[in-house]
């Protein structure tokens, strides 16, 4: 509701409170339970309980904030009552609660379904990789577990750029949908292109940095990890840009009322990932490197599908050169400079 009103401050405070109380309460509960002699399983349960406590605190904050700042808007917004500032000549009435619920479900279910499908496909993919490493590539269970473990470490860093883009996608949805509702299609198109440009400015340098500096990053964060780590991170660094692009494109499609199309792209991308991994991971010479390649290919496919949907459904073709040219050029120069400086430092400093 606050985001729909263009107010992101409550969301920021809410997220900070949730994380803060989750960590503090979880640590306190785990420590108290362990000192009381309940053992590690119960202590772990106490730490997990901190997640619920953080969620409850954040919910209470939003309820209090809503009552303090938006309570004056609640009373008039009931079925059959004119909205504030309406004149007697206005025929438009506020939608009923049932219609609002139906609209929310019709929009939310495809979005939630697409997210669930991707999570399910990722779970299937993890099982598939372990199985193909053993049954087809000929690795032992321990070797396959080590390879998939280092892939999981690279995934942690791979998810970092998307963490910066997700809040932006939340912010642009009401901006674009509001412009479309007012009939300001030109403003909606400009906002869409600006959002994609901001996404590129953030994700391209981060992706290039992860790719170029994969070796030192993995060695610093995971010094005793498997040697495959830097190569995996380098591939996933390239994929991270397409992940951010897909997130922004999904937000644009959802804001314009085409949320079902995002579900199609998510399912298609997940299936592509499974197919690519099925063949590549089975090759002993490729093994676990096939997993990040599958991720890269799947998100490239999703980005292209979303772009086509935006062009067809919205009758608008974003100017890709104007959006990506300068961020890409700057990122390449940055990557070259970072690689050269790291090489010099490693050579003379060690």
Describe the function of each predicted region.
Residues 110, 143-165, 196-198:
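Alpha-helical transmembrane segments of polytopic membrane transporters and translocases
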Residues 1-15, 238-268, 278:
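Membrane-interface junctions at transmembrane-helix termini in multi-pass inner-membrane proteins
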Residues 5, 9, 20-59, 260, ...:
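Membrane-interface helix-loop junctions in multi-pass transport and translocation proteins
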Residues 11, 15, 48-51, 55, ...:
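Residue-level signature of transmembrane alpha-helical cores of multipass secondary-active transporters
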Residues 39-93, 100-104, 191-211, 217-221, ...:
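Short alpha-helical transmembrane segments in multi-pass integral membrane proteins
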Residues 145, 193, 210-243:
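Interfacial segments at transmembrane-helix termini and the short loops linking adjacent helices
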Residues 249-257, 307-324:
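Alpha-helical transmembrane segments
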Residues 162-184, 196:
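Helix-loop junctions and terminal segments of transmembrane helices
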